[in-house]
């Protein structure tokens, strides 16, 4: 669901795709460094998350440690999830997505880059999803603006 501008009392038209194909953006952002790490994958499961954690681990500065905020999705809490040594997972309480800074990123991407779009095929879904993430990741000010939370800042 998205929002669009329309005259009061009118019913705006928007393209709609009723197929059931999708991909998943596994994304993370560091507001202080204004850096991001992401993978676009065909499934959301513990194997895909392990790939994402490995990608984040590679992007963490040497000697640094990353704290990732996670919700309670099943694959986020898998017992066999391999978490790299330079990453700590912070699990949110149930039904509290507003505490996850990345939720605003997903809302932004859906509302500004991916909404009201009909995709040609699966490859087009992947291409446009990657383009949406790249648009976000290439703007350090936007990364900081959307993901910064005063309660989540660690001062060294």
What label would you give each PLM region?
Residues 39, 78, 108:
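Residues that scaffold the ATP/ADP-binding catalytic core of kinase and kinase-like folds
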Residues 1-54, 148-156:
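Extended, low-complexity cationic-aromatic segments
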Residues 48-92:
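RNase H-like DDE/DDD metal-dependent nuclease/strand-transfer catalytic core used by mobile genetic elements
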Residues 1, 78-81, 102:
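Short, well-ordered secondary-structure micro-motifs
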Residues 22, 70-72, 90-114, 125:
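RNase H-like two-metal-ion nuclease catalytic core shared by retroviral integrases
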Residues 30-33, 73-76, 95-97:
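Short, solvent-exposed loop/turn segments at secondary-structure junctions
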Residues 102-156:
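C-terminal anion-handling pockets and recognition modules
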């Amino acid at each position: 669901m998205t929002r669009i501008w329309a005259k009061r009392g009118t019913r705006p038209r928007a393209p709609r795709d009723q197929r059931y194909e999708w991909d998943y953006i596994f994304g993370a952002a560091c507001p202080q460094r204004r850096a991001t790490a992401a993978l676009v994958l065909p499934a959301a499961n513990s194997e895909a998350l392990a790939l994402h954690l490995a990608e984040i681990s590679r992007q963490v500065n040497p000697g640094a440690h990353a704290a990732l905020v996670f919700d309670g999705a099943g694959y986020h809490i898998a017992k066999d999830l391999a978490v790299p040594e330079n990453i700590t997972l912070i699990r949110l309480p149930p039904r509290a997505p507003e505490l996850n800074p990345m939720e605003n990123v997903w809302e932004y991407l859906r509302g500004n880059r991916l909404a009201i779009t009909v995709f040609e095929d699966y490859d087009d879904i992947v291409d446009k999803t990657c383009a949406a993430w790249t648009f976000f990741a290439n703007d350090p000010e936007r990364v900081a603006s959307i993901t910064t939370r005063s309660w989540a800042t660690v001062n060294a």
